[in-house]
Swiss-Prot record:
It comes from the Bacteria. The chain crosses the membrane at residues 8-28. SUPFAM superfamilies: Heme chaperone CcmE. One of its GO terms (biological process) is cytochrome complex assembly. This is Cytochrome c-type biogenesis protein CcmE. Heme chaperone required for the biogenesis of c-type cytochromes. Transiently binds heme delivered by CcmC and transfers the heme to apo-cytochromes in a process facilitated by CcmF and CcmH. It comes from Methylobacterium radiotolerans (strain ATCC 27329 / DSM 1819 / JCM 2831 / NBRC 15690 / NCIMB 10815 / 0-1).
Length: 170
């Protein structure tokens, strides 16, 4: 066997082992991959009930309803479509109506979403691009985050607010 032929066989064997390793890794991860969807994606695509996914958008104003035993119902919207969400548990401190949210759970028959994890958006990095684009088109978005229709509140400082107490300078 010539040196060139041995090298070719070695390269082919290494390539086969690498392809097998990548295939096994992807197969092992396929059960834990959770796809991200917006309410419009859920409405337009035929997603089977029981499918595990992440739902992202804004908590619709006026949709938050608290029930017994820490149950919470609310609606997530991307300004085009809305999905009803049912969640049992403690909500994050930053969770409120009009705020961005990502909920992970299962799509149930009838289009309702049963969430087992809710994450509140605290900066624009959690906002899905489609939702941010829709908010920009409606004029509800300014650079740095959604626009609530008024100026941003000024931060409270000891010098500006006497209720915080005197400012000590050393």
């Amino acid at each position: 066997m010539t040196r060139k032929k041995r090298r070719l066989i070695l390269i082919a064997a290494c390539g086969s082992v690498l392809a097998l390793a990548v295939g096994l890794i992807l197969y092992a991860m396929s059960g834990s991959i959770v796809f991200f969807r917006s309410p419009t994606d859920i409405a337009k695509q035929a997603i089977a009930p029981g499918t595990r996914l992440r739902l992202g958008g804004l908590v619709k104003d006026g949709s938050l309803r608290r029930g017994p035993d820490q149950t919470v119902d609310f609606a997530v919207t991307d300004t085009n479509e809305t999905v009803e969400v049912h969640y049992k548990g403690l909500l994050p401190d930053l969770f409120r109506e009009g705020q961005g949210v990502v909920a992970e759970g299962v799509l149930e028959p009838g289009g309702q979403f049963r969430a087992d994890t809710v994450l509140a958006k605290h900066d624009e990095s959690y906002m899905p691009r489609e939702v941010a684009d829709a908010l920009k088109a409606q004029g509800r978005w300014q650079e740095g985050g959604p626009n609530r229709g008024g100026p941003a509140p000024k931060p409270a400082t000891a010098a500006a607010d006497s209720t915080l107490g005197p400012r000590s300078e050393r």
